[in-house]
Structure formats: structure tokens, C-alpha cells
Regions:
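Short, low-complexity disordered leader/linker segments with a strong preference
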Residues: 1-40
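A residue-level marker of the well-folded mature domains of exported/periplasmic proteins
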Residues: 29-271
Length: 271
């Protein structure tokens, strides 16, 4: 899944460059000449994690860095000073001040930043990863939102001309993981999620469905069991590690599919 998301990131960056050049080249010759002299400068802003989390932030960082190197494009990353909307917005402000004209936002927590910054910086392209219509509506509407984005025009809350919100079908990766685990001979599976947010839940639901599909195919539905829990955070700690110890120990769990940033460390330590 990380490889697939990395490939998608490369495609999105290429599309951002193409869109930028196309937008600049449709006016007078002088404007086209000026635009040709402007070079793309890419920035990435991390969410609550870091570029060494061996998860979403690190994958995004490495994909941006590799693409920048391959295409001779300057790239920098910014880590907000705290886990807050204000800090993330401040990092975007700093990236723009440093000359970035394509900014990659890593995670659903950037919905408020997309709303606030896309109109403020109309000449900057934003790639918002895992930011869904529901995330935008929840932050844009606030109190009174009925949690059905289909009831609203999401583009009322951000500048659609310079923002691309990219979400993924995590349930497909989850399905393949659950299916493969059962086909490889595991019968007692576990799913450890981070916070119970849509992307994590899609991984989990797919995992359960994949395990169930494999069990039905093998005719062993009464033998396959799945433990399921979300830790409520995107990092491992002693409490979650202890919880995983009970899974591997007294419950007899054989394999754990961990999804949610650094929370995987607790499953790995317990194993």
C-alpha cells in the first residue's frame, strides 16, 4: 500500500506541474515567457507525525524528495511546532514565504488549513492527502453539520481552482491483507488501528472482509477469528504494547495488521 501511495504521489506532483504550466501559458507572450522562468518549488507539511514515522508522513516525504531530485525541483519539508490547526497553518505560511508554489499536506487534519489558506494563496497549488469532502464540510460548516457531505456543496468552503483533495480506497489494501493472512495459514488475526477515522476504519473493514472471504473460500469460517481495536492515537506506547501482549499471549493471536502511523510499534514490540 505504501508503494501504491508513493506512485500516486508522483502522479499528483506531475499533474500539479502540468496544470501550473498550462494555466500560465494561455495569455500574452510576455506572460508566457515570465511563467517559463518561474520554477516549481515543492514543500510538504507533516501532520502530527514526523518524516521518520515509517508510515504516512515518511512515505509522503520520500516520494516528494525522490520526485524533486529526479526532476531537478527544489523540495523542503516543514514540521509544525505543535499538533494544532494554528501550527499547521503557520507552517504553510512559512512555506509560502520561502517561495513554495506547490504544497503537499499530509493528512485529514489539514482540512481547516485547506479552507483558510487556499483563498489566501490563490497562486499556490495544494495537494491535500486524505482530506475528504466530509473533512472539509465538518470544518467549514461547524456546528449543525449532519455528517453527510452529499447534502452540501463542498466547494463552497475552499478554492477548488488550486486544491486537489486525494483520498484512497484503503479497504482494498485491507482486504488483500486479510485475505492473504488466512490463505497463508493464519487463523487468529488481529487489527490494531490508530484513531477511529475514516481512512483507518476502511483498512479495518477491508481486513475483516478479506479474512472472511478467504475463510469462506477454504470452507473454514468456523476456524477464523479476528480481534479488532483502535488505540485512539497514532503512536505506540506502553499501554497499547501491553494490550498487544494479551493478544499474542492469552488470546493466541498469530498476526496483527497495524494501521495508524507509529502505533504499529506496539504490535511489533509485543510480537
Amino acid at each position: 500500500d505504501a508503494i501504491m501511495k508513493r506512485k500516486i504521489m508522483v502522479v499528483l506532483l506531475a499533474a500539479a506541474m502540468t496544470g501550473s504550466l498550462a494555466g500560465c501559458g494561455s495569455t500574452q507572450n510576455k506572460n508566457a515567457a515570465d511563467a517559463s522562468e518561474e520554477k516549481m518549488k515543492v514543500a510538504m507539511v507533516t501532520d502530527s507525525g514526523d518524516i521518520t514515522d515509517q508510515s504516512f508522513n515518511q512515505m509522503t516525504y520520500e516520494a516528494c524528495k525522490a520526485w524533486g531530485k529526479e526532476n531537478d525541483i527544489e523540495f523542503n519539508y516543514y514540521k509544525p511546532q505543535s499538533d494544532s490547526d494554528e501550527a499547521r497553518t503557520a507552517s504553510v505560511d512559512q512555506a509560502v514565504a520561502d517561495g513554495a508554489n506547490v504544497i503537499v499536506l499530509s493528512g485529514y487534519v489539514f482540512a481547516p488549513t485547506v479552507i483558510d489558506e487556499s483563498d489566501l494563496y490563490p497562486e499556490v497549488k495544494f495537494l491535500a492527502l486524505d482530506v475528504s469532502a466530509g473533512d472539509i464540510c465538518e470544518k467549514g460548516i461547524g456546528e449543525g453539520y449532519d455528517y453527510n457531505p452529499d447534502h452540501y456543496n463542498v466547494t463552497d468552503y475552499y478554492n477548488e481552482d488550486n486544491v486537489y483533495c486525494c483520498t484512497y480506497q484503503e479497504e482494498l489494501s485491507g482486504f488483500m491483507a486479510g485475505y492473504a493472512a488466512v490463505m497463508l495459514g493464519y487463523r487468529h488475526l488481529g487489527f490494531l488501528g490508530g484513531m477511529s477515522v475514516p481512512a483507518v476504519n476502511r483498512y479495518g473493514y477491508g481486513y475483516v472482509q478479506g479474512a472472511d472471504a478467504a475463510a469462506k473460500e477454504l470452507g473454514i469460517t468456523d476456524e477464523v477469528q479476528v480481534e479488532y481495536v483502535c488505540g485512539g492515537q497514532f503512536y505506540g506506547d506502553a499501554d497499547i504494547t501491553a494490550y498487544m501482549d494479551t493478544w499474542y499471549g492469552s488470546k493466541g493471536v498469530e498476526v496483527v495488521f497495524a494501521c495508524g502511523g507509529g502505533i504499529y510499534t506496539s504490535a511489533a514490540e509485543a510480537a
